[in-house]
Amino acid sequence: MKMKFTQREIRQVFLACGLMLMLGWFTLYSSYLWQDYTVSQNILQEKKQVPVLMYHHLVPQAEVYGIFADNNIVITVEKFREQMTCLKEQGYQTISLAQLQRFLAGEEELPQKSIVLTFDDGYLSNYKYAYPILQELGYHGVIFLLTSVVEEQPQQYTARGVQYLSWQEIAQMGDVFEFGCHTDHLHKLTLSGKGILTAASPTEVAADLELARQKMGEVSYYCYPYGHYTERTIETLEREGVKLAFTIGAEHVKRGDDPLRLKCWDMYQYELQEVLETIQ
């Protein structure tokens, strides 16, 4: 017995088939688009350049005199605020060192305009000036502590000298700053003008790291004093479990970089816009 279909039923069958074909084509096309998007994003991430800006001591313009005049570790508070405001207005987002570590390992994609802010030594001015500015802007930073000079009790700030952070102040800044190691007591120069880290034996470097750990806890992130290191230094840090280490150089961080030879821009030497204009 032959089945008879009405015109309406036939139209419904054709419509259903058409919809199925369209859905299949759309699914396939979407898959291609997603693959293209994923490839494009991967390419962008592979090419992404992350500036790491290095600061030290902040001093108000009115107090830049004496030992702070033409001092290569000093930037004025006013200039620092101006630079941070400029970054914010241009859409830059600060990232943590853990994010940078995952980015280098290919495990995380970063925002288009990512940047890392670092401060060496652990000056009290970081607490007095940098901390409230970054807090106000919703920015994150890293302080590489010279653990041998961290104070047991908070010190009175004065522009007539240099004071360092206390452990109490370090704890208070945890909402804005994370902390790495700038050695415990190897922030010195040899007679030839090189960082003493370059002359230290692996045993001495490891012992210095252990002193830092006893004071600040685990050390995953490290900054070479004066930017100086040797292959032996790097081998020691790797054995000791350090994940990222920073030196000085006019280059941005990108995938493929050695995580123990990452470059920081010394912001005493460069203008912010000069740094940003080098991003490709």
PLM region descriptions:
Residues 1-7:
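N-terminal secretory signal peptides that target proteins for export/translocation
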Residues 50-60, 113-115, 124, 129, ...:
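Metal-dependent polysaccharide deacetylase catalytic core of the NodB/CE4 family, i.e.
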Residues 93, 178, 243-244, 261:
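Conserved beta-strand segments of alpha/beta enzyme cores
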